[in-house]
């Protein structure tokens, strides 16, 4: 499982580096437009690195997700409970990033998300969450569930945070 996930990151970075270099050459620019940045970064991840990671992890036994009934009121109650946790997590991430950078860190993901661009919607709102939920929740948790439900969730969350390499989002 770990080898598959590590290989995913290595393949992703290698292919993204090659593809972005090619796009710089083809577009004759030193500053890639948003669509080109997304194509260079996300295409190798979604179409090559993630599927290869799943193939490598394929030998590990999969334990399917159990289904639980939840009434709308219970869902709403849990949702409301999550907001303060997210806020506190955001504060911790901001304080840690500020502390470690001497106050010079900036939240590039937040800055990028604030720009309205159709490519942001496609890659940050639609494709990103779909592929990330698939790999980190479905594939990773179902393969680590044999170590316990909580362990699987924590492992998935930690790997999600490490792959994003963003202290601002680390505690979400």
Predicted regions mapped to residue ranges:
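Juxtamembrane helix-loop-helix connectors linking adjacent transmembrane helices
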Residues: 30-36, 63-134, 142
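Transmembrane helix-loop-helix hairpins at the membrane interface
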Residues: 120-172
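Aromatic-anchored segments of alpha-helical transmembrane domains
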Residues: 10-18, 87, 157-165
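N-terminal, membrane-interfacial amphipathic/helix-forming hydrophobic leader that caps
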Residues: 1-84
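Aromatic-residue detector
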Residues: 38-43, 49-53, 59, 105-108, ...
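Alpha-helical transmembrane segments of polytopic integral membrane proteins
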Residues: 16, 20, 49-54, 58, ...
């Amino acid at each position: 499982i770990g080898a598959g996930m590590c290989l995913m990151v290595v393949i992703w970075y290698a292919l993204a580096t090659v593809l972005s270099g090619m796009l710089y050459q083809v577009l004759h620019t030193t500053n890639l437009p948003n669509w080109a940045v997304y194509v260079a970064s996300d295409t190798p991840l979604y179409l090559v690195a993630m599927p290869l990671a799943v193939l490598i992890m394929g030998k590990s036994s999969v334990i399917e997700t159990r289904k639980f009934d939840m009434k709308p009121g219970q869902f709403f109650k849990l949702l409301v409970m999550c907001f303060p946790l997210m806020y506190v997590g955001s504060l911790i991430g901001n304080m840690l990033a500020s502390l470690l950078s001497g106050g010079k860190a900036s939240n590039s993901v937040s800055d990028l998300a604030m720009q309205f661009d159709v490519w942001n919607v496609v890659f940050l709102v639609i494709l990103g969450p779909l592929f990330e939920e698939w790999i980190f929740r479905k594939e990773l948790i179902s393969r680590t569930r044999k170590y316990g439900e909580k362990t699987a969730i924590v492992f998935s969350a930690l790997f999600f945070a490490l792959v994003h390499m963003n202290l601002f989002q680390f505690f979400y």
